[in-house]
From Swiss-Prot:
Residues 106-116, 169-185, 235-236 are lumenal. Its main location: Golgi. It comes from the Eukaryota. GO terms for cellular component: cis-Golgi network; COPII-coated ER to Golgi transport vesicle; endoplasmic reticulum; Golgi medial cisterna; Golgi membrane; Golgi trans cisterna; trans-Golgi network. InterPro entries: Yip1/4-like, Yip1_dom. Belongs to the YIP1 family. It comes from Rattus norvegicus. It is found in: Golgi apparatus membrane. This is Protein YIPF6. One of its GO terms (molecular function) is identical protein binding. The chain crosses the membrane at residues 85-105, 117-137, 148-168, 186-206, 214-234.
Amino acid sequence: MAEAEDSPGEQEATSSKPLFAGLSDVSISQDIPIEGEITIPSGTRAQECDSSTLNESIRRTIMRDLKAVGRKFMHVLYPRKSNTLLRDWDLWGPLILCVSLALMLQKSSVEGKRDGGSPEFAEVFVIIWFGAVTITLNSKLLGGNISFFQSLCVLGYCVLPLNIAMLICRLLLLAGQGPINFMIRLFVVLVMFAWSVIASTAFLADCQPPNRKALAVYPVFLFYFVVSWMILTFTP
């Protein structure tokens, strides 16, 4: 004979029983170990060791920084829209360019006393860095999405064409002064001035709101114009 079906009372009691009621009787042994080791693949470990600079030699660190500066120089000499100069910013290159330009614009102490119109080292240094800071603050006030040091990096590296112009002018002045010499120096300075402006705007223009790009580029134009004027009016 088939088993009798459960009474409605028994079914109701079974359905009202909690789902996890039996888990209260389950106990976990205290002897189960909960220790373990986390293994790192050898390839990942090697990459971390390569990326770490704590154990590298001073010579290797200097060479790595010089190579990075050289790559940024190439970005300025061949300006194109790229985020490399903004992403991997540094101030070593701008410092080197600023010091070298100030040294080339400085006369000897005897000539400086005789001709008071020549800019001194400190004057050139202050003009370049004060101008770069002013342009950076103007960019931030206009709503630019570039950091303070990124802007200083771009403006400093883009002085490179003017450094080349100053070097060429110094070499031309060794042949003496004259109208032809001045016209050649004027042409060189104008070309390098345009190069600096184009290179800097290629990196900074996209960091400004579309309706305020002209307001952000105008101070850059004035900044490099002042530096170019100091180069053009320099006489040994």
